[in-house]
Design a protein with these regions (language model features):
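Short, flexible loop segments at the rims of nucleotide/cofactor-binding pockets, characterized by
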Residues: 2-3, 76, 149, 176-178
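Hydrophobic faces of well-ordered beta-strands that scaffold small-molecule active sites
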Residues: 3-7, 24-26, 55-60, 98-100, ...
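Active-site-proximal loop/turn and secondary-structure-junction residues that shape catalytic pockets
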Residues: 9-11, 28-30, 61-64, 104-106, ...
Length: 266
């Protein structure tokens, strides 16, 4: 597996490289800046140019103002234009994965039927999937904890929507924190194995990097292994403080590797 931290700080990215991580995951608003001119994006790239660690994923695909479900969903052409900018810039930076969590943009208003939301969401994925494919980018739909978002909560649910898009560029992400908050089983990950393209994790209950509080990641890694997943895993949680960050990140990485080895041993 390849391990990363989520960060928008080049200094923290440099610490991750020193600690032995394989890549970093940034956010679309901070790094790609799709609502800003090209010069803003180039400045983002320049900020990371001297940090010797690749950027291989970007999260927070849609800002909350670009609603994609409900009666106030923005026009499809506007969403597609935004997505095209994101994919084009990610491709220019060599970033192959964009994470479609964006709970604020997809949360359903009271009374809006899930069936209508499914139709809206699949229509969007079907429209933007080919755009992503053309740029060599994959879209990872991220199921979120029910306490954070009321739409797309389980890994198998996300996979079903990805399949319905008809696009090979659309897959699903398994996030250990959300998966555990929702009390999912390994079965939801196994049911998504044909569309599983990315993973996140953090501790429960405090949503921290591994090693900061006790948490057993082995069940999550066993579920990933059962699904045949051996790809990228990004830590999306609170990181160690700056005083001993490199040591803390090394501990996080060691914790993950040990949990993975434990899972593989059964």
């Amino acid at each position: 597996m390849r391990y990363a931290i989520c960060t928008n700080d080049p200094a923290v990215a440099a610490d991750a490289r020193e600690a032995g991580f394989d890549y970093i995951e940034v956010s679309v608003p901070s790094f790609v800046k799709p609502l800003e001119p090209e010069e803003a994006f180039e400045a983002s790239r320049e900020a990371y140019r001297d940090v010797d660690i690749p950027i291989e994923a970007a999260n927070l695909f849609l800002p909350r103002e670009l609603r994609c479900t409900g009666p106030d969903a923005v026009p499809m052409d506007r969403l597609a234009d935004y997505a095209e900018t994101v994919f084009r810039r990610l491709a220019a930076a060599g970033v192959p994965i964009v994470v479609f969590g964006s709970g604020g943009a997809r949360k359903l208003p009271d009374g809006w039927p899930k069936e209508k939301a499914d139709g809206q969401f699949v229509a969007l994925l079907s429209r933007i999937g080919p755009l992503a494919e053309r740029h060599g980018v994959q879209i990872a739909v991220e199921p979120l904890a029910r306490v954070e978002c009321n739409y797309i909560n389980t890994v198998d649910e996300g996979a079903a929507l990805a399949r319905a898009s008809g696009s090979p560029a659309v897959g699903v992400l398994a996030d250990c924190y959300h998966w555990a908050r929702n009390e999912e089983t390994a079965g939801t990950i196994l049911a998504a194995k044909d569309r599983l393209i990315h993973a996140h994790l953090a501790t429960m209950p405090s949503r921290k990097a591994p090693g900061i509080e006790p948490y057993d990641f082995a069940p999550f890694f066993r579920a990933l292994a059962a699904a045949g997943y051996d790809g990228r895993v990004s830590i999306e949680g609170g990181l160690p403080g700056p005083e001993r960050r490199v040591d803390g990140l090394r501990k996080a990485l060691d914790t993950l590797r040990a949990a993975h080895e434990t899972a593989l041993r059964g």
